[in-house]
Amino acid sequence: MLAAAPSAKPNRALLFGVFGTLFFLTLLLGAQTPPYNDGRQIIDPAENLIYRGSFGIPLAGGSVFYNPRPMFVSLVHVPSVLLRRGLSALFPAADSVIRTLTFHLVPAAILGLTGMLMIRFLLLIGVGVLAASLSTSALAFSTILFVYGRVVWSDILQAAMFWGFFSELVLAAREPGRGGAIKVGVWAGLLINTKYTFVLALPGAALFLALEAWPRLRARGLAALFAWTAVAFLPFVLFILWSNHHRWSDAFSAGYGGVPFQESLFWGLYSLLFSYGKGLFIYNPVLALAMHNHRLPNRYWLAIALVCLPIVLLYAKASDWAGDWSWGPRYLIFIVPVLMVPVAVRLNTWIEKRRYFLVGLFGVLAMTGVGVQLVGAGAYWDHFIRLSQATAFEWLGNPNRAGNYSNKHGAHCDPCYEDLHNHTYTPAFQPIEGNYWLLKHWFKGDRWEACEKDMPWRRYTSLPLASPKAFCSTIEVDWWFMPFRKNYRTAGRILLGFFIIALAGCLRLWVRGCRTCGGKGLAVASPGP
């Protein structure tokens, strides 16, 4: 495994500085879009719990809707709902903008937590503080974590909990003991409370821990290690059973319908990694460096194979591998922090050996990723997806959905190939290029005639398509300050100034923490027997 350099000690100033910097910068660049689709299903139960005392959403006719997702993904938003309730009581006329702002607090905080966990782990395994800081910054702002840190979806929570679990697993395997086992159990419990699919990670995690700890603990010590892990894990399982029974009157019912798994495993995996509209490396270019790392001992890759690969293969087999309406491969967001570690190790080697050209390569890929995420954050992804569907139907015809795998035969079907293949598989409707095209003309203030000339699909057809016109005229930058410019300009400026000052203070704390924590070197221990 990787061994920590003696001087690499993450301190409180560094950790809080990282958290605060990522939190306030994400808020500064935060969205104005209220929760839609999955976001509504996550935030509505939290709102209903605070305002009406019930987790269920009342529907017409007296029925009640329960979100089939684990209850935990909604409960984490309770603090923001409480804050909104308090502020709206003081300023009732501003409830709409208060609601938008407060609902984005928790995702931004979770992104900050992920970065804090990342830099802590990197320092503990011996990565130098400069490489650790640069890699943590890249994780937060040059990968899809940034886009999902701005919206009320559960994906950023999944990424944070998976990284917390995976990193503690690796640390516990390096130095097995009661404390590490308890941490692994707690993180495992939190993880499966974000998405039940992550249960697939647990057998591989147990096997990895057993393989690593066996030479030192043998049977009795290993049994004690797993016992402590189980004790910490059990309360979270009981919470799931209770929440299922509360919602469905059946502790073992998750409330989900059937999900088809009909995709070719090869093409599903290929599409998750390399497809035009959902490829992991298109949306996270800096992760390409993870695939070229040879200094990382095999045990880390063994952990990835045992813990992460079963989940990736399941998603590859799913007919809905693309994740519906979303930015990039959201089903793979959980593995993004995991793959950033080899990138950090590689970067640290380049810095130590003063290979500035290769350090520059990291910078180019990271800044390219920043550009990708800014394009994705600049306009809410639904806008271009709706545009691409309307344009494709006008250009290529309305598809025949009679044979699709859903029960929506003949109607619009979000997860179906007929409706989503255009922006998933074809370069004509690639979302990064599409969002860039929309934002470019919005910033220029162009009329439709100018927008029409360089539409991405103009490379393939000269037809005068009318569908995009309405979408181009309604595009607006997805930034929280935009509505404040119209009605609450003074309040908006005060908030803007507060975010900037808080960001500067946290950034200074980060720098001070770097100066005091040391840890310039990278120590690689023997990979073990």
Where are these regions (language model features)?
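Membrane-proximal envelope and lipid/glycan-remodeling enzymes
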Residues: 1-529
